[in-house]
């Protein structure tokens, strides 16, 4: 095989694999099982993260946010304000999230939960419209990372971008 043939075959093989490279991101069957750790500090932070995910983000129980977020709560999402009051206002007033009283199981799909020192990162599947093809969708992974101080989230990061203005 000549070098030219080898390069051509390699290019065609890589092109074919690129067209079929993406596999959907899939969550685990029991996401709550990922929020446990044998290390007491990591377990406390993972459990607080579970409450943030379940009671706050899933069920909108923002009246309880002070149980798991500090007053300072440094927010790095460009759409939400920092501070406990700021993030509560963002979810309850700006997004209009309604409170659900029954909240006994996390239903959000979760791929993995990673804890290291004061940080907990949750990886979740996300599906978006494919901008290259009308009606098609693609999958990717969203993440939320929190830094904990004394068992409460004090700082948050995610890959959010600035939301477009609301349609008038």
Task: Label every model-predicted segment.
Residues 21-63, 67, 71:
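Short, low-complexity N-terminal intrinsically disordered segments enriched in polar/charged residues
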Residues 8-9, 19:
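Cleavable N-terminal signal peptides
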Residues 62-118:
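A solvent-exposed, acidic/Ser-Thr-rich amphipathic alpha-helical stretch
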Residues 23, 139-167:
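Short beta-strand edge/turn micro-motifs at domain boundaries
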Residues 1-7:
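Bacterial N-terminal signal peptides that target proteins for export
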Residues 98-101, 128-139:
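Short, cysteine-centered beta-strand-loop-beta hairpins and adjacent loop/turn segments enriched
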Residues 116-126:
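A short hydrophobic beta-strand element
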